[in-house]
């Protein structure tokens, strides 16, 4: 198992991801954004959080044009698994690999806290180790996490079982129907605003993210 963790200018969660996979005993490698190909034998691509290119224009809008993203798009179209966390989710949306858009938080503030989440679907490789309706406690940290999609797109998400996680209780950013994470129709590309890599050890206050990464890595 080889995992490619992408790194853009402004990415700041890449070493958290490497540490998380090390805890699971899985090999992972950083891949610089200027690379034109993914490493041979890549089984999973992770686009971690941060502020790629300073979030100028829109979060993820510039990173989408980095050379490595063409390789990621090809990889995803061939059925490869891709996980985008926070800024990674934004990059996946900007790249057209996931539907919808991520807008400024409704309260116009950066939000950083532990957040309760509900598992909506486990019929996918990302959440297969969780039970439907299970409550998770995973940190969020973002200013542009307000997920939006039009009425037709929302209906398609529901019909295709693409809504995987929702915020439980308080909606921290105004996301439509409290959506926290969605996947593509093929269930091979998943984007979420919460940070599972920050919920890997008891010392961090939660281990609820561990099963997500373990399910992908093992």
UniProtKB/Swiss-Prot annotation:
Keyword NAD: no
Pathway noted in the entry: Purine metabolism; IMP biosynthesis via de novo pathway; 5-amino-1-(5-phospho-D-ribosyl)imidazole from N(2)-formyl-N(1)-(5-phospho-D-ribosyl)glycinamide: step 1/2
Organism domain of life: Bacteria
A single Gene Ontology CC term: cytoplasm
Pfam family for this entry, one: GATase_5
UniProt xrefs under SUPFAM superfamilies: Class I glutamine amidotransferase-like (SSF52317)
Ranges where the Glutamine amidotransferase type-1 domain occurs: 2-218
CDD domains: GATase1_FGAR_AT
Catalytic machinery residues: 86, 195, 197
Keyword entries, A-Z: ATP-binding, Cytoplasm, Glutamine amidotransferase, Hydrolase, Ligase, Nucleotide-binding, Purine biosynthesis
Keyword Cytoplasm set for record: yes
Gene Ontology MF terms in the entry: ATP binding; glutaminase activity; phosphoribosylformylglycinamidine synthase activity
Record-level GO BP terms: 'de novo' IMP biosynthetic process
Compartments in which it is found: Cytoplasm
EC number: 6.3.5.3, 3.5.1.2
Subunit structure: Part of the FGAM synthase complex composed of 1 PurL, 1 PurQ and 2 PurS subunits.
Its job: Part of the phosphoribosylformylglycinamidine synthase complex involved in the purines biosynthetic pathway. Catalyzes the ATP-dependent conversion of formylglycinamide ribonucleotide (FGAR) and glutamine to yield formylglycinamidine ribonucleotide (FGAM) and glutamate. The FGAM synthase complex is composed of three subunits. PurQ produces an ammonia molecule by converting glutamine to glutamate. PurL transfers the ammonia molecule to FGAR to form FGAM in an ATP-dependent manner.
Full protein name: Phosphoribosylformylglycinamidine synthase subunit PurQ
Species of the source: Wolinella succinogenes (strain ATCC 29543 / DSM 1740 / CCUG 13145 / JCM 31913 / LMG 7466 / NCTC 11488 / FDC 602W)
UniProt lineage: Bacteria, Pseudomonadati, Campylobacterota, Epsilonproteobacteria, Campylobacterales
Gene designation per UniProt: purQ
